[in-house]
Amino acid sequence: MKEVQCISNVDNFLIVDKKLYFSNGKEVIGENGHSILISPLSLQFLNYKEPYFYIPDIYGNTYLIMENEVRFLKDIFIKDVISDSLLLVSKDKKTAVFDIKNNEFHYVLNFRIFKFLEWKKKYFLKNKNNIQGIEICTGQFLWEFSLSLLGKHKNPYTDEVKDFEVRRLIGIYNNILWVFLNAKGFIGLDIETGKLKYRIPEFHQAIGKTITSSYEDRKGFFRSDYLLDNEKGKIFGLGVDVYIEIDLNQEPPFATQYGLQEEFEKYNVKGNDTAEDYVVQDNLLYFSLFNQLKFGVLDINTKEIIYISEPIAVVERDDSFTQLKDLKVSENKVYILDSNDTLHIFEREKLNFEL
């Protein structure tokens, strides 16, 4: 890997169709440095779902970036793009379907939604202590699963007894909705009925060494942005120096923890600051060590770390400690944003990472 470009004043960024788009907090910049949008108010995160880009400002308005125009949607927060004419939005502390061609709202829920998953014109969402299934355009409830049915859990470090909560709606495989809970466990719900089909409170098998062996909750799952690979039928995630893989093709699903301590030690690195988010492309998992200012690549087939970079050159500031805060991959390029708002672009010249 070699760094081929460095762009300053980047607040957040996206890669769409192999092209870089980013916001500097006041402006959205497209390919070749072309300005797409300038806002008088501070902007938040740039989003994309075909066919639109959209970005909210700090006051709850949203800019909808269309092919031939930019529309300012006052007091409207876009949650999702349903089609080229329909948006799912938050307005007046409620959830509505907004017809952008006819400028009409149809309220479907009397509350705002935050964590949700769209699948075949249905939404699966978290509402307080429940997981619900609804039809998108009508708001009709299909089912509801109460997390209270799972009982309570005890924090292994404080002995505090707490309710279960949804940390992440991961995805759907074979008509099962997979959910990661705050107590570091997984549940699988039937998407037609909402009934609990599977519960995985801890992994079944451990392979390899890990620096987490002394942890009180050592059979639990670490916080991570777990991903579902529908082609392989597997859920996987990375936390600290642990790689988790859940095989959904087995009955019941089987969870394996792979300790990567020795893999990290090959590069004289400790895997104690791996970021929760990562990217998987062509059986390679790209991750960052956010405090060590490095990034690496794990082969998820062999469970071997095949590359770890040298520390990324950053400009330190007197008032803060620089970290890596975002990583994206597009074909042979790796994009890494640091906390000083500098985007570093690396190019991979060989698949075996010999450079």
Residue ranges and their predicted role:
Residues 1-355:
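Secretory-pathway ectodomains
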